[in-house]
């Protein structure tokens, strides 16, 4: 039986969820693909653990870490066939994730990105590096996780032209807006989202529209062939919204949503435009019924018409999106030979 060695960089809540799901699906990988999948390395901010025969109890909190194994040194020691990058998002510099992905792709390992920063900063460069080394770069976990955004573009609508993609890509803002329309103050709604584990302790990344803008930037570049920088995307957040405005929306039967939009413009030079804006929808629109904690995406195509998908957010769903990418690699037969 062939083997596939997997390493995870970034071992917080999502990285640990990836490890748990991976362990639970090992028998499935053996039975369906004839591949023995082994988790050979995990990397945290304080160091890493590596065992080419497979880590025993990778979730052990008290296991010693080798502080010398970070970045390229970790990739060299683990020698993974697949690196799953699950570290924090740093959309200004790409953070440690950028170094891990570059090292893995350059070493001939497939990359599965969950954190967004590296992709926002240099998706074209990472894609070129993957192509040059004959490996795949998969990004489902970074583009609204369980919501099938990049898959809609790459697979479901591959036989036509996608003219518009728009979506409710950030569950935190959708939750807060939903609660505000129910009469809850912004600060209280945000505190609820934090207690539910949906919003970060510093939620500005979500409520100021940065999270949605990052996802839109990645999708525009990866799915529409654009070369947009994050600061080229017009961006709005969800605060402040006055009580009077909320009352007017209620009276008019409108529902507010923070929406990311990508549009392919026609003309002499076909171009892609992207934005994040606070929009309102009548009850008949698909987005109006997307409740608290949910996400949705809609595309307009030339041949298939309109397609809509809806999903829920959670660390487990994000981890599952990364394993969907991993399973696609197994389906392609590019790992475990």
Where are these regions (language model features)?
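Rossmann-fold NAD(P)-binding glycine/threonine-rich loop
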Residues: 89-106, 114-143, 147-154
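Rossmann-like NAD(P)H-binding beta-loop-alpha module
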Residues: 131-199, 210
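ATP-dependent carboxylate/acyl-activation modules
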Residues: 286-337
């Amino acid at each position: 039986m062939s083997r596939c060695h997997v390493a995870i960089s970034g071992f917080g809540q999502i990285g640990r969820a990836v490890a748990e799901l991976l362990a639970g699906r090992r028998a499935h990988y053996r039975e369906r693909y004839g591949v023995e999948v082994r988790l050979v390395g995990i990397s945290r901010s304080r160091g890493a653990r590596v065992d080419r025969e497979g880590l025993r109890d990778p979730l052990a909190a008290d296991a010693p870490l080798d502080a010398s194994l970070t970045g390229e040194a970790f990739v060299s020691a683990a020698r993974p066939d697949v690196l799953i990058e699950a570290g924090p998002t740093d959309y200004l510099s790409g953070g440690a994730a950028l170094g891990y992905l570059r090292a893995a792709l350059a070493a001939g390992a497939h990359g599965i990105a969950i954190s967004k920063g590296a992709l926002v900063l240099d998706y074209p460069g990472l894609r070129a590096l993957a192509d040059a080394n004959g490996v795949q770069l998969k990004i489902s976990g970074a583009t609204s996780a369980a919501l099938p955004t990049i898959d809609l573009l790459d697979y479901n609508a591959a036989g036509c032209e996608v003219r518009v993609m728009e979506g409710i890509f950030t569950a935190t803002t959708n939750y807060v807006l939903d609660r505000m329309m129910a009469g809850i103050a912004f600060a209280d709604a945000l505190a609820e989202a934090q207690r539910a584990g949906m919003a970060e302790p510093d939620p500005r990344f979500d409520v100021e529209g940065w999270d949605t803008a990052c996802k839109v930037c990645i999708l525009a570049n990866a799915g529409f062939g654009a070369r947009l920088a994050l600061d080229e995307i017009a961006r709005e957040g969800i605060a402040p919204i006055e009580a009077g405005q909320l009352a007017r929306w209620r009276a008019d039967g409108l529902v507010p949503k923070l929406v990311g939009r990508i549009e392919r413009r026609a003309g002499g030079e076909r171009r892609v435009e992207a934005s994040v804006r606070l929009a309102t929808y009548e009850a008949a629109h698909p987005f109006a019924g997307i409740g608290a904690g949910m996400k949705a995406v809609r595309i307009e195509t030339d041949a298939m018409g309109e397609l809509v998908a809806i999903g829920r957010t959670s660390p487990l769903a994000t981890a599952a999106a990364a394993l969907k990418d991993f399973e696609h690699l197994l389906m392609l037969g590019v790992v475990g030979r």
